[in-house]
Design a protein with these regions (language model features):
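Short acidic active-site motifs
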Residues: 45-46, 168
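Structural motif
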Residues: 52-53, 175
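C-terminal module of multi-pass small-molecule transporters
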Residues: 42-43, 50
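Long, low-complexity C-terminal extensions of enzymes
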Residues: 163-166, 172-175, 179-180, 185, ...
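Glycine-rich, proline-tolerant flexible connector loops at the mouths of alpha/beta enzymes
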Residues: 61-65, 182-195
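An alpha-helical appendage that flanks or caps ligand/catalytic pockets
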Residues: 1-31, 62-174, 203-217
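Conserved, mostly hydrophobic/aromatic
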Residues: 37, 50, 74, 102, ...
């Protein structure tokens, strides 16, 4: 209602709204009558809810096997509900001219982390994650190193040379990932490096794969 009406009142089990008006309201078009809904989570309940209701399901950082397992389950729920869901993945990107340089940056980030802060977040996060019925909630199995970049961004292993990172991004795409939410250490300089050195390689890989798919058999 708050997307389409003014002075909204709502009384629910978990929150209440009184005389609320949202401005500006979302753009309303026939093609998209409401904003796309993004949901994160890891538990069985979150995956089911995402498949049934979300337009995008966002995952913490995961390796290939972890992404595939989660993606298949969420999209199975979506298919059962007669829907389609796009999939996003968190990933911390460390792109350098050599893999050695990139790994050294990773080592330095972990070494300089605020240990009490990370451990405090880990303890609270794992308590919450393990409170779910299946103990599969967010951060339930995250290590100290995973949580230095708070949403397990290092697990996606987007760390290395531009060529290595581009190949890994393409591999995630093949597995069904539609979008990567990238994090950077020094974001202004590193986004520029990523755009100049990594992204063109990703586009080259995608174009080559498309040309191969379109080639006559």
């Amino acid at each position: 209602k708050i997307w389409t009406e003014d002075d909204v009142d709502f009384r629910g089990d978990f929150y209440r709204i009184h005389d609320f008006t949202l401005k500006p309201k979302p753009l309303n078009t026939p093609e998209r009558p409401n904003p796309e809904l993004f949901q994160g989570g890891n538990s069985t309940a979150a995956r089911r809810n995402g498949g049934h209701h979300a337009d995008w399901y966002f995952s913490n950082g995961k390796d290939f096997d972890g992404v595939t397992e989660q993606l298949v389950e969420v999209r199975d729920h979506a298919r059962d509900a007669g829907r389609e869901v796009k999939f996003g993945l968190n990933g911390f990107i460390i792109a350098r001219d050599t893999e050695k340089e990139a790994r050294e940056v990773l080592r330095e980030i972990v070494a300089k982390a605020n240990r009490p802060a990370v451990e405090g977040f880990r303890d609270a996060g794992q308590q919450a994650g393990n409170s779910t019925a299946d103990k599969r909630g967010m951060w339930a199995d995250s290590s100290f190193e995973d949580l230095v970049q708070y949403n397990d961004g290092f697990r996606s292993q987007l760390i290395g040379t531009p060529e290595q990172i581009a190949e890994r991004i393409a591999a995630y795409r093949r597995r069904g990932v539609d979008l990567i939410l990238g994090g950077f250490l020094h974001f202004q300089e590193e986004i520029e490096y990523f755009g100049a050195r990594v992204l063109p390689l990703v586009r080259e890989i995608e174009e080559a794969e498309q040309n191969s798919a379109d080639a006559p058999v």
